[in-house]
Amino acid sequence: ALPISGGEDNIEIGNPGWYIVVVKVTLEGRNYKYAVDFYKPEVYLTGDTSGGWDSFTEANMFTVPEGKGEFVSPAFVASGEVRMCIKLADIDWWKSEFIILGGKIEYRGTGEDQERAMGNAGQKAYLNFIDNKGAIK
């Protein structure tokens, strides 16, 4: 379990670091109900550059920086479109997809496919979520 606890209005994180925060909103009668979940910061490379689709294994996972720094993908096993995401239970991966365009992390959200960034075998993706920048090199 993650070192997170909370009271009525506060969330306390026992260990500083990177987390994925998911906020779910439901409507109960005329009131909104909010649920906040915390997950490990598991970011994945998927698609041709990872060797296949829907393979969310440790081999396709980015390294997580200590403190400030970059998340770094494994080396691309093939050339092609660079596709990245987080994987949440019961959510299609592409709904949490993001890519690198013009040196920035661009999130897909609910839209259509984005313009693609290409990578070559042996390269890696570098993501800095603090300043929303990314690179393929």
Predicted feature descriptions by range:
Residues A1-K137:
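Insoluble glucan recognition modules
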